UniProtKB/Swiss-Prot annotation:
This protein's name: Small, acid-soluble spore protein P
Induction: Expressed only in the forespore compartment of sporulating cells.
Example GO BP: sporulation resulting in formation of a cellular spore
Gene that encodes it: sspP
InterPro entries the record matches: SASP_SspP (IPR012614)
Similarity comment text for this entry: Belongs to the SspP family.
Length: 47
C-alpha cells in the first residue's frame, strides 16, 4: 500500500503541477535530441 501511495503522490504531483503538461513535451524533446545525436553519429560514419 505504501508503494501505491508513493506512486499516487508522484502522479498527483505531476498532474497537479502545471509543469505536468510541458513535462511530456520536454521528454519528447529529449528523445528528439537523442535521435538527432544518433543521426549525427550516423552521418559521421557515412563520412
Amino acid at each position: 500500500m505504501e508503494k501505491n501511495n508513493s506512486k499516487s503522490i508522484r502522479q498527483n504531483s505531476k498532474k497537479g503541477q502545471p509543469s505536468g503538461q510541458p513535462e511530456p513535451l520536454s521528454g519528447s524533446h529529449k528523445v528528439k535530441n537523442r535521435n538527432h545525436s544518433r543521426q549525427k553519429h550516423h552521418a559521421h560514419h557515412d563520412m
